[in-house]
Amino acid sequence: MRVLPATLLVGAATAATPAQQVLGGLQDFGNAVQDAMHENLPKINKPLEAFQEQLKSLYEAREFWEEVANAFPQNLDHNPVFSLPKKHTRRPDSHWDHIVRGADVQSVWVTGENGEKEREIEGKLEAYDLRIKKTDPSSLGIDPDVKQYTGYLDDNENDKHLFYWFFESRNDPKNDPVVLWLNGGPGCSSLTGLFMELGPSSIDENIKPVYNPYAWNSNASVIFLDQPVNVGYSYSGSTVSDTVAAGKDVYALLTLFFKQFPEYAEQDFHIAGESYAGHYIPVFTSEILSHQKRNINLKSVLIGNGLTDGLTQYEYYRPMACGEGGYPAVLDESSCRSMDNALGRCQSMIESCYNSESAWVCVPASIYCNNALLAPYQRTGQNVYDVRGKCEDESNLCYKGMGYVSEYLNKPEVRAAVGAEVDGYDSCNFDINRNFLFHGDWMKPYHRLVPGILEQIPVLIYAGDADFICNWLGNKAWTEALEWPGHKEFAAAPMEDLKIVDNEHTGKKIGQIKTHGNFTFMRLYGGGHMVPMDQPEASLEFFNRWLGGEWF
């Protein structure tokens, strides 16, 4: 059905005009009409202006879709993906050592400063439960001297069940901070971060755990969370297709965990993650900070090689692919020119997405920009996560090690030891990835939340300088472009050498750093998309120093 704009505008104006009243004479009637029109004109114009903006956005969206359909028809062969629920068997309550009921937490009332009754902890937690089991490390051979907990956060109202794995600090758990780790995707399990990057063990080609001396739980307790639902060991009868929907789940998990373990709640708490966590972390952090009455002692956030501000970051795919990021060019001159030519249109689409935040605009922006600026690199067969080498295993995001992790976590004895309720494990769920893309989440301007976060806590953006897909050039650029009170000083701050200071390699240059106020950017030499995997010593160095408060 097609409706002309003029018809709609006239109809709206007519509907907004007040009903006529019976007056004493024609002159009075005319004056009354003029007065009524004058009085109500702003009321008429405001919805008309809003409606005109909506029409403009719709026309623009139609143009975008037609352009994308003509240029990349293969990318529109998509229907919303409603994944079949994972096969699972819920364990009886008797299996778990603790079950923390959100309703019980919400039932605790205290007397506030004004003398009125208020909830001890804010948030809508009634539908949530947290199941907790102390895991026997000796049965897995993973950090056998470290206390571990596994379990599920249950959203009983929406049939969502998020799996987590907690490792206590190897050092001083009574005083060391607590960190939540999130992998990206969207749709990839944080257990890949555990076993490929920063956890207490890696998995070798024999599918056996190998001790990691550079694990991030060397001086911090770490929680690895499989989110959103239907990722890793998590499962649900429903689906999640945008970042905001997952924020309340994370707040509930942390609140109930710290309620059960107040000894950890007393410690400093930090959120860290990589890749699409550049979307997750600003949203999750804002959700936590929005609650004044909370038991989460949030002190800072860390985002590694993240996607946070697409408008700025997509500009740096061409430079990184064409030899301007510190490594040899991957693409030839013709491909580089093609990317240059496509950039302007890509950015105009992203700007429209930022203005409307509508899926109708944001989806074609993602499709166009990814095909124009990412696909030329992907077609070379080079690893998008590391410009220094080829993609060695396309079925496992270029890394054979990811296949080892999946094989290990699919072992029945491993699933039994950690209390997993699903019948199988996949490192990444690509249905979720597509759903996030086709709901417009990929290009949304979540970087706009960062200034509000900086008002309250420090933020570290770090980037391995060999990554292509979330490269250091783009991450440095968006941090320097971000509008916040310290913008000018941060942008003008020089990049200084980052050196090891506390081991036998003292003085070794591991990267560059710039900082002002609560904002810090780091470039890590020789790190790809997964810095802790590529540069374990350097990553533990900056991680420990960041948690120690050296730069804030």
Swiss-Prot record:
InterPro entries: AB_hydrolase_fold, Peptidase_S10, Propeptide_carboxypepY, Ser_caboxypep_ser_AS. Disruption phenotype: Decreases strongly intracellular carboxypeptidase activity. Glycans are attached at residues 219, 518. GO terms for molecular function: carboxypeptidase activity; serine-type carboxypeptidase activity. One of its GO terms (biological process) is proteolysis. It is found in: Vacuole. It catalyses: Release of a C-terminal amino acid with broad specificity. Pfam families: Carbpep_Y_N (PF05388), Peptidase_S10 (PF00450). Keywords: Carboxypeptidase, Disulfide bond, Glycoprotein, Hydrolase, Protease, Signal, Vacuole, Zymogen. Disulfide bonds join 188-428, 322-336, 346-369, 353-362, 391-398. The active site is at 275, 467, 529. Residues 1-17 form the signal peptide. One of its GO terms (cellular component) is fungal-type vacuole. Its EC number is 3.4.16.5. Vacuolar carboxypeptidase involved in degradation of small peptides. Digests preferentially peptides containing an aliphatic or hydrophobic residue in P1' position, as well as methionine, leucine or phenylalanine in P1 position of ester substrate. This is Carboxypeptidase Y homolog A. The lineage of its organism: Eukaryota, Fungi, Dikarya, Ascomycota, Pezizomycotina. The gene is cpyA.
